[in-house]
Amino acid sequence: MISFESDYNNGMLPEILEALGKTNGDKTSGYGFDPYSESAKEKIRKAVDNENAEVFFLTGGTQTNTTVIDSVLMGCEGVICVETGHIEVHESGAVEAFGHKVITLPGKNSKLTTGTLSAYMDSFLADESHPHMVQPGMVYISMPTEFGMVYTREELAALYATCQKYDLRLFIDGARLGYGLVSAACDYDLPFLAKHCDVFYIGGTKVGAMMGEAVVFSGMKAPKYFFTNVKRHGALLAKGRMLGIQFDTLFTDELYFKISRHAIAMATRIRSIFEKHGITIAYDSPTNQQFVVLSPTLYEALSQKVAFEIWERKSEHEIICRFVTSWATKEEELDELDHILQAYA
């Protein structure tokens, strides 16, 4: 069976496996205080074009989101995101578990617009009883979004300016950041993104690493005791160099972006294969997540030979399904998908 189920169902890049093997006998200090982690941090600072950026390595995406949000916000503050935001839908109430309300607003193509944000904040501040409410303290967005959409240069700059107007911190979830930045729909680079938010993270788990995310405080100083809070949230790895080595490898010779381009190329071909067989594309995603509309009959037949996820049962006759590519996706797998679909054309 071929699989397009997710971008983290393989082990890790061969280059990372090799680097871990080569350094296996080394003895270094723990918790990220090692030369590999320092090298990785320096490479990331160079990549974001900010020598003062503060970089921290955490174990996974949910831990990263909860740690950053809980560390930046006061106890009475909440975080704003769209209704389809990852922290609202797919993180098991983790943010709320640490005492911060997720304030949801409607999105446009799964993106938060400045108009929606401004309207909410104006309405909130106009309410004389707002001191008795959860105070908005942060805006959370994903790049790319849950539906694979990409914020444009203009949208991101405007959103950050709006956040600054209302004294809100902008936090960008970059679990799939590489795929967003190299997509044809993206008209900016990593330094631009870093300059137009307060804090973001560079995803490793979904972009070639065995595990790990790199948090970058680029528009603000890291909160006091952030490192301690990372441990409090269970996101600090004692063998910290395991994360440092991975990001040091990913940011050597632009490997992070090279593998992201490969995934985008594979996703583009998947889309063309579905279109060739007359299958409707559900969302116009330019990234490594592709969404198609299948009939129940085709879904049942295809799922016997291909692994993928149901995204939404839209109706009795339509099932939206997600197909995801990664560094590990092979042309031969796409050939096989094409061949399988021919039988049902």
Region roles according to the model:
Residues 71-89, 118:
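Conserved PLP-anchoring active-site segment centered on the Schiff-base-forming lysine
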Residues 75-76, 268-269, 273-343:
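Conserved C-terminal alpha-helix-loop-beta "cap" of PLP-dependent enzymes
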Residues 151-183:
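Catalytic PLP-binding core of fold-type I/II PLP enzymes
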Residues 13-61, 83-88, 94:
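Conserved N-terminal alpha-helix of the aminotransferase class I/II PLP-enzyme fold
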Residues 99-137, 141-144, 151-158:
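PLP-dependent aminotransferase-class I/II
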Residues 3-6, 55-59, 81-82, 141, ...:
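General beta-strand structural signal in soluble alpha/beta enzymes
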Residues 135, 142, 150, 187-286:
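Active-site C-terminal subdomain of aminotransferase-like
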